[in-house]
Structure formats: structure tokens, C-alpha cells
Amino acid sequence: MAEYHIIMRISSLFALFLLFLQPALAEGLPELGDTAQLSLTPQAERRVGESIMRDIRLHDPDFADDPEVAEYLNAIGYRLVSNSQDARQDFEFFLVKDPTLNAFALPGGYIGVHTGLIITAQSESELAAVLAHEIAHVTQHHMARMVSKDGQLSTAVLAAMALAILARNSQLGSAAAAIGQASAITAQIGFTREFEREADRIGFLTLEKSGFDVRAMPAFFVRMQRAGRLYENNAPAYLRTHPVTTERIADAENRIQGVAYKQTPDSLDFQLVRAKLRADQGTARDALAQLEGDLREKKFSNETAARYGLAVALLRGKDPVRAEAELAPLLKTTDHPMFSGLLARIKQAKGDNKGAADTLRQALVRYPNNRSLNYAYIEALQQLGQNREAVSQLDQQIKNYPRDARLYALQAKGYASLGKRLLQHQAQAEVYVLQGSVSSAIEQLQLAQKSGDGDFYQLSSVDARLRDLKLQLAEETKQAKEKK
């Protein structure tokens, strides 16, 4: 019975991928079993990626909505992107709650990173090496080139892409044999060796230009190869989609020969993010015991990060008093936004919402552009009933990040508390737009029209947005009919 559910999951992912890919293609997809000419433009790749990401955010229980970790991943990611072959490409790096050691690239610049990769990375340069490799897959448009190889598109290739991108569970890979075209799918899973070599070469250059230790790349490959031999059929997930060959290791080792050694210490950001994720592993009791044991036995690379992780675990274990005591010495010696964020959460757990808001307000003076602190501050203001100030903060944040659904959701909540129904429905409409539900957004704008409040300019704004969305929905409906 379990195998049946696994197979159905694969089938649904494949169908989902076809559904997402279809609107983006200029010529449409072929019937199952046929082949056809295909051109997947960068714009189409982005639309495909956006569609898949919307589904991941809404329906994937493993999607980790952690602003602090996301902020770090995007900081290190864009440090690499700025030194890549296409710095103009938009990227978004996101976290996946999965203990396996893996990362993957979606079409259009979306790169998922498993918690297991961050936790087990032996250095920040090692994490950067994996990200640089995934960035190269995107900038070299390997997904589009895989689809259009030899000018042909086959159902097997599409199925393989769906599996490689979406089926992270090792059981899915083993159950793929139950699908009729198993041999063709197996042959296509993962990127081709040619693409892997190209991503290694370009990723290496990006890693070097970004100031990381390039020796981390072959070191990571060697570690993965050893893990593959040790675990055989239960090899790390990275090996199943990015096979590490002796040739790849040799190529990476040859590249570092001409590079002068440069000591590259890990950033405190990396150390803290890794400590936070370790504190979130397993049960609260097990995580706490592990972290206390590591500190007692001095099994850590950075004591500040280790004690921060312990404070996170203590708060998770509903002991805010001990958590604050553990954090207090760190606050005296080191200023970091993650410390301020944790202190605010500790104060909230102790029932001191005003103290939490004050902590966040003071931190934002030092870190005004920190998104996780801004989210937390707005939520703290709303908890205190200070909705006018919260809405004022949201207006500024939305100007900076106009495609952030979380901000619009908070804005809708704030306007609802203030009794501003038109603005509430208008904000909620933008949440639905960003989630890909245009019809739901239209319903919200129609409710805004009937709200009975709002001035002439606000009503005019609602009317204009409603017209635009109706045209968009009509065009999407037309395209869907043409594809049938």
C-alpha cells in the first residue's frame, strides 16, 4: 500500500510539472509518447519556476518558512551570483526541511537547500561550493538545454525532470521503476555528465571570485564519494542527482593546483544558522541533550554559535528563563541581528510583548534592512494592538519588497484590526495574486468595491487593479483552452 502512495505521488508530481510547463511553452507540449520541437526561453523558465515555487510554498510541508535562514541563504547566494557568468539573473534561495545532504535548482533561478546540507557542511566554503554549482546549472540554462537537446522533447525527459526536481525522497526514486517508462526515466534522472562538468568548472570560478576556499569543492566531492561507498543503496541524496565520479574529483583537484592557498574563516552568520538548525533537529529534548553534551565536551568550532544554539533549544523546550540566561553573556560581547531576534522571542514567551517590541525597535536602528527583524517587529506591534504603526512599517517594507506575500498578509491583518475593509481586501488580493490564485484575488477586489469605505483614490486604485486582473484571468483561460 505504501508503494501505491509513492507511485501516485510520482504521478501527481509529473502531472503537476506538465501543467506548470505547458503555459510557458511557445508551441505547447506534445501528446504523451510523442516528441516535438521545443524552445524554452529564459522568460518561460522563470514562469515555470514561479509556478513550481508557488506550489511548494502552499503545499509542500517540507518548505521551511524561516526568514532568518532565508536571509542568510540569499546573502551568501547573491554573493556568489554577483561573481557568476550572469549576475543579471534573478535568484531566490530557500530552505527545505530535509535531513539529507542535498540542494537542487528549479527553472528560473530558484534554488532549494536542504537543512541537512547546512548542518553537515564542514565549512561555509563547502556550502558555497554546492550553491555555486547549482547557480551554474541556472546561468547555463541546463534545464532548457536538457529539454531541447537535439531539438526533441520526450515524455521520459519531462518525467525525469519532474522527479529530479520534486521527488527528493529516496523512496520515490526506487519506486520510479513501477512507472512504465522506468528505463528511460532512470537514464535521464539528474543532469548529464556534460552539464555536471560544466557546472563544476563554472561553479569553481564563481567560488574563487567570491573569495571562498576553492579546496572545499574537491573535499566535498571526496566526502560524498566515501559516503556513497559506505552506504551503498542508501547514498546521500546529492549523489543520486549529482553523481560524483573519479573524473569529477580529479578535475576539481587539478583546478586548485594553480590557486594560492587562502585561509577563509567561516562567517558568524554561517555558524549561527547552522547552530539554529541543529537546535531544531529531532525532538526538543534530544536536541537539548546533544547541544549540552557538545558544549560540555567542547565539541564545537565556535563557542558563541554553540551557546546560541543551546539558547534556541532551551526556548524550543519551553524554558525561556534558562534560554535568556544562556543568551545574556553573548549579548554583552557580540552584536548580531539573530541574537536580537532570539531575545525578542524569549521575551514574548515570557509574556513581555512590549519588551520584545522594544528589543526589535532598537535592533532595527542598527540593522534597518534586516527582513527577519522587520517581520518580527511588525508582528510584535500587532500583538500590542499598535496597528497604525504596524501598517506604517508595512507600507515602507512593501515599497522595498513589492512581491513579498508575507508583508501583504500582515498588511491585510493590520487593516482588518483598524476596520479598514477596502484596504484589507485590497491587501488580501495581492496575497492571492502572489500565490497564483487570480480568481480569488478578483473576489477580494470585488469585496473591496462593496466595502462601503475608502476614498475616491482608493476606490479608483481597486477598480484599476480589478480590470487588470480580469484581463489576466481571461488571457490565462484562453491559453488553457488552446492547449487542450
Tell where the protein language model's regions lie, with residue ranges.
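TPR/TPR-like alpha-solenoid repeats
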Residues: 111, 120, 138, 259, ...
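Short pre-active-site segment immediately N-terminal to the catalytic Zn-binding motif
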Residues: 112-129, 189-194
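Catalytic Zn2+-binding segment of zinc metalloproteases
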Residues: 125, 135-152
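Membrane-active amphipathic alpha-helices enriched in small hydrophobic residues
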Residues: 154-169, 175-187
